[in-house]
Amino acid sequence: MHEVPPRLLGGRPAVRRRAVRPARSTLATVPKLTPKIILEGTRLTRKTDLAFALNEHPRIVGPRRYRYHSPLISAEWCGFTPHPWGRGPINFEPGGEEEARALAVFDTWVRLIELQPHYSWIIDRFHISARAHQLTAHEHALDFRTLEERLRALDVHVVLCTRRDGTWEAARDERLLISGNPSQYDDLDFFRREQELLRRLAGESILPVLELDTTDGDLDALCGQVADWMSATGGLWPREATEAS
């Protein structure tokens, strides 16, 4: 097959320019960002907004020219029942098939991270929330010690999102403008109690924990605080990379 000659421009053949090869990237010399962050907190603490913000923040997942599907998972997903606001890995019915399924979900997600450790993982509520709910709703104590050992081996960090006293009412008013299930915000004392319980349970965890006051809602500043903390702990990068540097 013959090549089509270049078009004539002003009576002269058009000049074919050689493609310029881009300069070799220096990214290969920079440690890969592989943070693994569990966001815990009661409702109205902006944890889900923060999860999405962290999952796109350049200091957490690296600079990007376009949106990318970094993993973001949540134990709040109510996938055990065929209706909205049903049950899932946090609020399962204890002592039977649902509890076994919930524990299998936690095990499966941790195994997934173990199989792909050199990547970022953002988790919106996980095992600490399950402990809190089961204690509150059923006086049922869950033992996640083995799970936490695996999470610690993966260098998973916990960010406990909290809200200052005196701001719950305003936060509820803001949420009710968009909520599809407003009755869940009737009892603000429940959220206050759950926040204290989550504080206690996070204090019992063997994982690194940062308590983060999210009241003011400046997501970029909050992401910066998380990035500063994880940079100080070394949790942003693979341990092999930080130990070799």
What are these regions (language model features)?
Residues 45, 52-114, 133-135:
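Conserved substrate/cofactor phosphate-moiety recognition/catalytic segment
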Residues 26-34:
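Phosphate-binding P-loop
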Residues 117-121, 155-157:
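Loop/turn-to-beta-strand initiation segments
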Residues 39:
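Hydrophobic anchor at the beta1->P-loop junction of P-loop NTPases
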Residues 196-245:
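NTP-dependent small-molecule kinase module
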Residues 9-24:
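N-terminal pre-Walker A segment at the start of P-loop NTPase domains
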Residues 99-109, 137-147, 184-196, 223-227:
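Well-ordered, non-membrane alpha-helical segments in soluble/globular domains
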Residues 140-141, 148-200:
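A glycine- and Lys/Arg-enriched "phosphate-lid" helix/loop adjacent to the NTP-binding pocket
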